[in-house]
């Protein structure tokens, strides 16, 4: 009896204590503003950043390969930039808006080479920006630690990044020749000898070296440099190159021919825009006799007004 009474008193004491005070609960500190749309696990996978293609293979100086698989970030103004060597460059808007912008500023594409030196990393085929794709050039500079030091946008949709690393502090760290396999080094030696013997012109020398760098995988061929087609068809490519203009002209010519055939098939006359009189251009139409039915620019008919 006494034991049962003791248990009853114990239960009553616990219920009287009530729940723990709200102040005792732990609070999680959010270090960065909203990243909705990027790291939200409840969103479908399609809402996350999606690249148009895979990055190019890792290439260049072997001592830089250790940077592959790592990412370095920098917050400037209201944007967070992230550079992942040999992978991509991304931008994330730091805001509390539900639709904060996040996008890809470029995917690892090729090196830039000048005077036997790797002068920069090109990240191309980023997210759409008007009629073109965003792209970034990353300059490697000597520094005490690996860090993304600076980001700017010198022209619309083109970004310039400076990445500091102790891996490029040696004066020969970015030379191209030592990174080449023996066979390509011998080819380069022959090209230099031919130039010295005046067997090739400076222009020919430059062209041969470019081909050599393409064989090494440091530069892309002209065909590989064709812009990746944006979602929405060929019209969304824009006219970034002469080849694109030629392709677009050819497609438009075929479409015009097809439409003319349809008009002829349905017995609908058509005239060229250049045949319109000056008075019509000025808004004064030449008087015409009314007809019961007036043809429009499509196969349909419109009744008299």
UniProtKB/Swiss-Prot annotation:
Its main location: secreted. InterPro entries: DMAP1-bd, Gtb1-like, Man6P_isomerase_rcpt-bd_dom_sf, MRH_dom, OS9-like_dom. One of its GO terms (molecular function) is protein homodimerization activity. The keyword Cell membrane does not apply. It is found in: Secreted; Golgi apparatus. Residues 69-171 form the MRH domain. Residues 176-279 form the DMAP1-binding domain. Keywords: Disease variant, Disulfide bond, Glycoprotein, Golgi apparatus, Mucolipidosis, Secreted, Signal. Residues 267-305 are annotated as: Disordered. GO terms for biological process: carbohydrate phosphorylation; N-glycan processing to lysosome. Disulfide bonds join 71-84, 129-157, 142-169. Gene3D superfamilies: Mannose-6-phosphate receptor binding domain. It is linked to Mucolipidosis type III complementation group C: Autosomal recessive disease of lysosomal hydrolase trafficking. Unlike the related diseases, mucolipidosis II and IIIA, the enzyme affected in mucolipidosis IIIC (GlcNAc-phosphotransferase) retains full transferase activity on synthetic substrates but lacks activity on lysosomal hydrolases. Typical clinical findings include stiffness of the hands and shoulders, claw-hand deformity, scoliosis, short stature, coarse facies, and mild intellectual disability. Homodimer; disulfide-linked. Hexamer of two alpha (GNPTAB), two beta (GNPTAB) and two gamma (GNPTG) subunits; disulfide-linked. The alpha and/or the beta subunits of the enzyme constitute the catalytic subunits. Non-catalytic subunit of the N-acetylglucosamine-1-phosphotransferase complex, an enzyme that catalyzes the formation of mannose 6-phosphate (M6P) markers on high mannose type oligosaccharides in the Golgi apparatus. Binds and presents the high mannose glycans of the acceptor to the catalytic alpha and beta subunits (GNPTAB). Enhances the rate of N-acetylglucosamine-1-phosphate transfer to the oligosaccharides of acid hydrolase acceptors. PANTHER family: N-ACETYLGLUCOSAMINE-1-PHOSPHOTRANSFERASE SUBUNIT GAMMA, N-LINKED OLIGOSACCHARIDE PROCESSING. This is N-acetylglucosamine-1-phosphotransferase subunit gamma. It comes from Homo sapiens.
């Amino acid at each position: 009896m006494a034991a049962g009474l003791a248990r009853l008193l114990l239960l009553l004491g616990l219920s009287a204590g009530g729940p723990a005070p709200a102040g005792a609960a732990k609070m999680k500190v959010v270090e960065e503003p909203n990243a909705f749309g990027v790291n939200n696990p409840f969103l479908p996978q399609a809402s996350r950043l999606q690249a148009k293609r895979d990055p190019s293979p890792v290439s260049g100086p072997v001592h830089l390969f250790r940077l592959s698989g790592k990412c370095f970030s920098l917050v400037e103004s209201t944007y967070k930039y992230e550079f992942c060597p040999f992978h991509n460059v991304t931008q994330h808007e730091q805001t509390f808006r539900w639709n904060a912008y996040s996008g890809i500023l470029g995917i690892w594409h090729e090196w830039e080479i000048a005077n036997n030196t790797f002068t920069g990393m090109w990240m191309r085929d980023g997210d759409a920006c008007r009629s073109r794709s965003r792209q970034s050039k990353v300059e490697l500079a000597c520094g005490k630690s690996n860090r993304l030091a600076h980001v700017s946008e010198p022209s619309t949709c083109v970004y310039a990044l400076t990445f500091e690393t102790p891996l490029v502090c040696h004066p020969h760290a970015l030379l191209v020749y030592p990174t080449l396999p023996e066979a390509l080094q011998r080819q380069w030696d022959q090209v230099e000898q031919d130039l010295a013997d005046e067997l090739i012109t400076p222009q020919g020398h430059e062209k041969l070296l470019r081909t050599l760098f393409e064989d090494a995988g440091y530069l892309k061929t002209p065909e590989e440099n064709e812009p990746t087609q944006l979602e929405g068809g060929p019209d969304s490519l824009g006219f970034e190159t002469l080849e694109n203009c030629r392709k677009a002209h050819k497609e438009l010519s075929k479409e015009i021919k097809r439409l003319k055939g349809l008009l002829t098939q349905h017995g609908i006359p058509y005239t060229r825009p250049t045949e319109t009189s000056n008075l019509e251009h000025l808004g004064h139409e030449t008087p015409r006799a009314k007809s019961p039915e007036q043809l429009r620019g499509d196969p349909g008919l419109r009744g008299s007004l």
